Amino acid sequence: MAQPDSSSLAEVLDRVLDKGVVVDVYARLSLVGIEILTVEARVVAASVDTFLHYAEEIAKIEQAELTAGAEAAPTPEA
């Protein structure tokens, strides 16, 4: 019987750092309609190179959205 292929911890860590992982959490605790605790968290695990690559791409997307919004906005007439 063949044993299933298993990955070492180093291989798993290498893949996570290469691809990146984002955990986004929003939780609210209320008791009798009174909000007691709210937790908002975003945890990102990635290598610096991966983070910089994706940050660059996100900046391009945001810039394109701003440019498109500015072109669509009516210009005030004098």
From Swiss-Prot:
Superkingdom of source: Archaea
User: Where, per UniProt, does this protein localize?
Assistant: Gas vesicle shell
Q: Which GO terms describe its molecular function?
A: structural molecule activity
What do we know about what induces or represses this protein's expression? Answer: Synthesizes gas vesicles at all stages of growth in media containing 15-25% NaCl, but not in 13% NaCl. This gene is highly transcribed in all salt levels tested, excpet for very low expression in stationary phase. Longer transcripts able to cover the whole locus are detected at much lower levels. The protein is expressed in both 13% and 20% NaCl (at protein level).
Q: What cellular component GO annotations does this protein have?
A: gas vesicle shell; vesicle membrane
Keyword annotations: Gas vesicle
Q: What more does the record tell us? A: In this organism gas vesicles are about 200 nm wide and 430 nm long. The organization of genes in the locus is quite different from Halobacterium and Haloferax, being gvpACNO followed on the same strand by gvpFGH; other genes have not been identifed.
User: What protein family is recorded?
Assistant: Belongs to the gas vesicle GvpA family.
Role, per record: Gas vesicles are hollow, gas filled proteinaceous nanostructures found in some microorganisms. During planktonic growth they allow positioning of the organism at a favorable depth for light or nutrient acquisition. GvpA forms the protein shell.
Record note on quaternary structure: The gas vesicle shell is 2 nm thick and consists of a single layer of this protein. It forms helical ribs nearly perpendicular to the long axis of the vesicle.
What name has this protein been given in UniProt?
A: Gas vesicle protein A
Q: Which organism is it from?
A: Halorubrum vacuolatum
